[in-house]
Structures are given as C-alpha cells and as structure tokens.
C-alpha cells in the first residue's frame, strides 16, 4: 500500500476517491465506515472499471522534461475526459478533474522554468512567491478549451531590490506562459497573465490594486474585478494569496458603491434572451434557428451574479457552486433559488463541455453557441428554465444592491 495512508468514507463516490488519490499522489485509499476500516480501493480498481486512469496522466506530467512532452500528455486527456463525461455526467466533478490536470501541467512548467532560470545563471527565486490562477482557473471551473488567466505575487524584497526582483519574475513568467501556450492554452487577449508587469506585484501592490478597484469602480475596474477577484494559489507560498484573499473579503462587504456598480454591470453584461419578445414569438411559431451563447448569455451572468453576492457576504470560496451553497447556508439565498441555480449551472456547464468536444473535432464550429435544434425537447425545456433562473438571479442581485445610494 502507498504511503501515507489516507482514509475515505464509504459514503463518498468513486470519483471523490479518484480525486483524493490524484491530489495526494497515492495509489490506495482505506475505506472507512463510522471511522472503522472496511476495505481498500486502488488505482487498479479504477482502471478495471474505467479502462483508463487519470492518475497515470498525473504521473506522466510530473516526470515530463519539456513543454512539448506536456503538450503530448494533454492530448491524451481529451479521450479520457470524454469517457468520464459519458459515464459520470456531473459538471462539478468534470471541471474539478480538468482543472486538476491543468494545475499539474502548470506546476510542472513552473518547476521546469525555475530550473531553466538556474541553468542560465539567473539563480533561484529572489523572493518568496506564488503563482496564481484567475478567472475560470481561479474558480476551478475550466473546461477542455480554455485560455490563460494567471498572475504572480511575491514578497517585497525592499526598495533597493524591487525592480531587479520583478524583472526576474517577469522573465521567469515568460517561460511558464510560453510553455502553457505550447501545451494548447492560448495567451489571454486581455493580457491577464503573469508576464504583464501590472499583474506581477508585491503583497502591498496587490492590496493597493484591489483597494483601488473597490474604492473607484470604473467600468475598467469592474472588468478587472470580474477576472482578478476569482483567484487562488497554484504554486509557491500559498500564505501570500490567503492574506490577500482575507483582506479582500474584509473590505468588499463594506464597499457599497462597488457592490452597486457590480450589480448594474451584471445586467449590462447581458441578459439571457429567453424572455425577449423575439425569442418568445419565434419559439411559439417555430421560426428560424434559435441559438444561445452558453458563455455570454448563461454561464457568465450566473457566475457574475453569484460573485457579487459572495463578495457582499465576504465568502472566501471561489467555485460558483461552493459560493451558492455557502450563500444558502448563510441565508443570503433561498433554498429554492439555490437549488435551481445549482441545477442550472450543472446543466449549462455540461452542454458547454459537450460543445467543447464537438469543437475540438471541428475547429470551424463555435465552442459556446448551441442551437435549440441540436437539443431534444427535454433539453430545450431544461435550457429555457435554466435561463429563466439566471434572470431571477440577476433581478435578485440588482434589487439588493442596485438601489444603494
């Protein structure tokens, strides 16, 4: 049996056992019932049931010696995820697994980048640091087709060494970002990457940036908040990121103008089309080909609305479903709306993942647009109901904060 010995409750799913093995880097788990060992589950059990095992990918990632090798390993991920998609069919589980594999690729590229800096005579890290994932990566909600959103935080080395230290990290970040690009993660068009000097900052500089966004919520600041405020540490000194998160969660509930502007921005960013007269008439008469942009008109407004509520309540969780559950637990969302939002999120994310697989095979297709004609009647109904739930969320958020003076 692998060491250390980790236990998992008998009530957990096989997928939870798989994720625990991947995260802990072990091949066996002790199954317990009321804290009493009742059995053992291993990688072999998963391989017997599933034919492939994600842990094998993780082992390959950790031993890869180049970005090109990692790119080949990532290609192996696609059929594996598609198989699990067909068998598991749970969006939260799938996005967690996809994100975990992407995290491992990023961490290996960081290790390779650090090694390369030393080989070139640049030395080791000049200060403690953490590589941060932002946006969907920060929320652990990545799908198979995604671009980069990352940043870097480092401990202030003092005014004499600050410029030199920042340049070291910028040069290092270029190696990681280039490696991610080789692995199939395009560079962010908005330059939300650690190679951007505005996102390669000390602790104090990050606090100043976040404070400025909260105090002066201009349209540009709100756009940044929609990406930067979903963040987590992937590698390095995690405490640097947690201190930043705790400070943000202390300030955001008291930033009333920011919350007001965020709620208005949530509406301006786009409303699901399901209640528009054009949609209703065409749906009733069967005219034309109705399409929905799953990112722009479904996931994005859902994520934005939940983020605003989470910031107002000082909730530290970053995954949208975890935020929804915590909001319900705190009485910030009704149980009815909470359950409806969770169902809507799961269904829409599954549609998006399915669309990603189709797009991966045919690059001429959009990865986010889905036509109602491509769905069966039950799926059409579920999609429309999900969009109506998102409209309810937007109205709830605006009613709560839109009128704040």
Per-region residue spans from a language model:
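Histidine- and aromatic-rich ligand-binding microenvironments
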Residues: 13, 45-46, 147
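A nucleotide- and high-energy phosphate-metabolite-utilizing enzyme signature
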Residues: 56-405
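Residue-level detector of anion-binding/catalytic polar loops
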Residues: 6, 27, 186
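Bateman (tandem CBS) regulatory domains
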Residues: 1-5, 147
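A short, polar/charged loop-to-alpha-helix boundary motif
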Residues: 44-60
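The conserved cystathionine-beta-synthase
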Residues: 7-25, 32
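A glycine-centered beta-loop-beta connector
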Residues: 21, 29-46
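Short, structural beta-strand-to-alpha-helix junction motif
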Residues: 1, 13-14, 66
């Amino acid at each position: 049996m692998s060491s250390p010995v980790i236990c998992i409750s008998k009530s957990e799913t096989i997928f939870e056992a798989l994720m625990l093995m991947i995260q802990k880097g072990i091949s066996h788990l002790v199954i317990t019932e009321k804290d009493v060992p009742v059995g053992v589950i291993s990688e072999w059990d998963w391989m017997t049931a599933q034919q492939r095992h994600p842990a094998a990918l993780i082992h390959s990632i950790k031993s890869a010696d180049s970005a090109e090798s990692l790119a080949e390993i990532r290609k192996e991920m696609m059929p594996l995820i598609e198989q699990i998609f067909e068998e598991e069919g749970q969006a939260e589980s799938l996005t967690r697994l996809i994100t975990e594999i992407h995290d491992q690729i990023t961490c290996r590229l960081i290790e390779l980048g650090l090694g390369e800096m030393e080989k070139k005579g640049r030395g080791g890290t000049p200060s403690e640091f953490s590589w941060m994932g932002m946006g969907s990566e920060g929320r652990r909600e990545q799908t198979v087709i995604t671009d980069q959103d990352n940043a870097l935080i480092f401990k202030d080395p003092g005014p004499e060494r600050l410029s030199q230290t920042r340049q070291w990290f910028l040069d290092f970040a270029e190696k990681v970002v280039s490696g991610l690009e080789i692995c199939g993660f395009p560079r962010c068009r908005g330059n939300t990457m650690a190679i951007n000097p505005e996102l390669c900052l000390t602790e104090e500089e990050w606090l100043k940036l976040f404070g400025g966004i909260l105090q002066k919520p201009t349209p540009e600041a709100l756009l940044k908040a929609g990406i930067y405020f979903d963040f987590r540490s992937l590698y390095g000194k995690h405490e640097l990121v947690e201190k930043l998160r705790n400070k943000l969660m202390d300030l955001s509930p008291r930033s009333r103008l920011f919350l007001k502007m965020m709620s208005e921005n949530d509406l301006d960013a786009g409303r699901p089309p399901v209640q528009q007269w054009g949609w209703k008439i065409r749906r009733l008469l069967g005219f034309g080909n109705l399409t929905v942009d799953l990112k722009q008109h479904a996931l994005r407004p859902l994520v934005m609305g939940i983020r605003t509520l989470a910031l107002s309540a000082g909730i530290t969780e970053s995954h949208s479903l975890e935020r929804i559950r915590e909001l319900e637990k705190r009485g910030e969302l009704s149980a009815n709306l909470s359950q409806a939002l969770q169902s809507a999120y799961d269904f829409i994310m599954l549609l998006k993942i399915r669309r990603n697989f189709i797009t991966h095979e045919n690059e001429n297709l959009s990865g986010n647009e889905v036509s109602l004609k491509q769905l069966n009647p039950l799926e059409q109904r579920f999609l429309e109901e999900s969009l109506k739930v998102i409209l309810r969320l937007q109205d709830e958020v605006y009613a709560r904060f839109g009128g704040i003076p």
